[in-house]
Design a protein with these regions (language model features):
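A short, structured beta-strand/loop element
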Residues: 23-59
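Residue-level preference for alpha-helix termini and adjacent loops
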Residues: 3-6, 45, 51, 73
Length: 75
């Protein structure tokens, strides 16, 4: 498995928006994204950090049920 890269928050948010996530709100230094699926609503919180730590991005990908390869295609 490849290492999760350290990316800026704006690139990550744009990638998730391409995947169908919608920005619901921005509060303080965090952005909240939602995506409705037939089974559930996936909710993500992205910190507005440049760059986002690799471990944080790894947890965000797990919450979104997305692989690193899928994220690379969306970037």
């Amino acid at each position: 498995m490849n290492k999760v890269p350290s990316l800026d928050y704006d690139k990550v948010v744009r990638a998730f928006q391409r995947d169908g996530f919608v920005v619901v709100r921005t509060r303080g230094s965090h952005i909240r994204l939602h995506k409705n699926t037939p089974e559930e609503t996936i909710k993500l919180t992205i910190p507005m950090h440049k760059p986002i730590k690799r471990s944080t991005l790894s947890h965000i990908l797990k919450q979104a049920d997305m692989t690193l390869e899928e994220l690379d295609k969306l970037l």
